[in-house]
């Protein structure tokens, strides 16, 4: 993945995440999600969130894409996705406040939606109900197909894939991936 000349000109660069980035990942996750964890999950308890996010970080190291976003050499965000045989999932976009709405969001969403069309695989993601990034996902064509107590479940390109189960709708797709045969 290569950044646009515009983003490079603004001082942005990308690097693959490695084991040494775990603390930075937890810091950025705290900056981006603490208010939602406080709102929906009885508060950000540091010890518990460190365990959860360290585990998440190590799983993400195995994803198809897990990169850090740098501004003049300083890590200011991270993004990830994981391509599976029948979908693109584990979507994550974490940006600190100073770099939000500077074009990184559009770059990342443009990249994964183009990939989805190219490989004919739907994208699935979860977004906190009160997170305003939901509107950006909608702008890029994501649709809410369900919800939990805390999240909207969104999809992109689900209607235009080679998924043989697609005719029966998203519920059957979700059942197929969640129920082991």
What would you call each of these model-derived segments?
Residues 92-101, 127-128:
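A short, internal acetyl-CoA/4′-phosphopantetheine-binding micro-motif in the GNAT/acyltransferase core
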Residues 55-68, 77:
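A short helix-loop-beta-strand connector motif used in the catalytic cores of GNAT acetyltransferases and
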Residues 101-114, 139:
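Conserved acetyl-CoA-binding loop-helix of GNAT-fold acetyltransferases
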Residues 106, 129-146:
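Conserved active-site alpha-helix within GNAT-family acetyltransferase domains
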Residues 1-20, 160-181:
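Conserved N-terminal entry element of GNAT/NAT acetyltransferase domains
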Residues 33-56:
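Conserved GNAT-fold acetyl-CoA-binding loop/helix
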Residues 68, 74-82, 89-92:
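Conserved beta-strand in the GNAT
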């Amino acid at each position: 993945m290569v950044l646009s000349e515009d983003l490079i000109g603004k001082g942005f660069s990308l690097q693959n995440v490695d084991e040494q980035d775990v603390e930075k990942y937890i810091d950025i996750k705290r900056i981006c999600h603490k208010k939602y964890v406080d709102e929906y999950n009885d508060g950000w308890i540091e010890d518990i969130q460190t365990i959860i996010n360290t585990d998440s970080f190590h799983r993400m190291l195995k994803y198809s894409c897990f990169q850090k976003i740098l501004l003049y050499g300083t890590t200011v965000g991270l993004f990830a996705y994981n391509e599976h045989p029948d979908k693109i999932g584990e979507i994550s976009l974490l940006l600190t406040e100073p770099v939000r709405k500077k074009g990184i969001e559009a770059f990342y969403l443009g990249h994964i939606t183009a990939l989805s069309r190219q490989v004919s695989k739907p994208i699935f993601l979860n977004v906190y109900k009160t997170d305003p990034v939901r509107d950006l996902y909608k702008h890029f064509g994501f649709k809410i197909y369900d919800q939990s107590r805390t999240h909207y479940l969104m999809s992109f390109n689900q209607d235009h894939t080679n998924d043989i189960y697609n005719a029966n709708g998203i519920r059957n797709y979700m059942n197929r991936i969640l129920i082991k045969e």
